[in-house]
Amino acid sequence: SGLDIAALCFEENDLLDQTEYTQAALVTVCMAMEKVLRERGLAPDVTAGLSLGEYCAIASAGGMSTENAITTVRKRGILMQNAVPGGQGAMAAVLGLDAGKIEEVLADRSGVMIANYNCPGQIVITGWKEDVEQAADALKEAGAKRVLPLNVSGPFHSSLLEQAGEELGKELEQVDFSDLQIPYVTNVTAEYVTDITKTKELL
C-alpha cells in the first residue's frame, strides 16, 4: 500500500491525527505486542477487541493474516474519513449520567446518538460536531458530571458512516479469511464466533 508503517508508528508525525493512519498504526502495534506475548509462551484461548480491536482479535484467532488486518483497517479508515468532511463530526464521553436519561435527552436530536455503552456511568455520544456540542450542554443540565470531547477525527459508531459501512462490506469480500484456530468474541452480539463465514457480516 506504499505506507511506511515503521515511520508511522515510531517517528513523530501529524498523520496519526487522521483515522486512515491511526487505525493501521493501532493494529500494527497491537499485533506486534501479541507476537511478543506468543514468543514468551503466552497464547490466548479466546480473543476479543472493541471496535477496531476486533480486527486484532480475528487476526490473533487465526482468521486473517496480520498484513490483511492492517491493509483492511487502512481502507476502513479511508472510507470512514471520506464519509464525513474533516472537522464536522465529533464524539464525547458522558460521565455520571444514567443511560436512560441520556437516551431521553437525545431522543429528539437527529444529529447525535449513542455510540458506545462503555460501562455504567460512561457512555459515548457521536454525531455532527454542532449537535454533539449542543447535546453536551443539555446532558450537563440533566445532571452529567462531565462531558469530555474525544480526540477523534470523525463521528465513529454513528449512522453518518452508514455508506462507509456498505463500502467496507464490498472491500471485505476481497479479503482472504482463514478458519479460526480459537474463538473470538464479537462486538455485535457479545457471543463467541467459531465459524469464520460469519465474520464478514459481523464486521
Label the model's feature ranges.
Residues 3, 12-13, 61-203:
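Alpha/beta catalytic cores of group-transfer enzymes, especially the acyltransferase/condensing modules
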Residues 1-48, 125:
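Helix-rich "cap/lid" substructures immediately adjacent to catalytic or cofactor-binding pockets
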Residues 28-35, 54, 67, 71-74:
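A broad detector of short, well-ordered amphipathic alpha-helices
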Residues 50-59, 63-64:
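Glycine-rich nucleophile elbow surrounding the catalytic serine of serine-hydrolase chemistry
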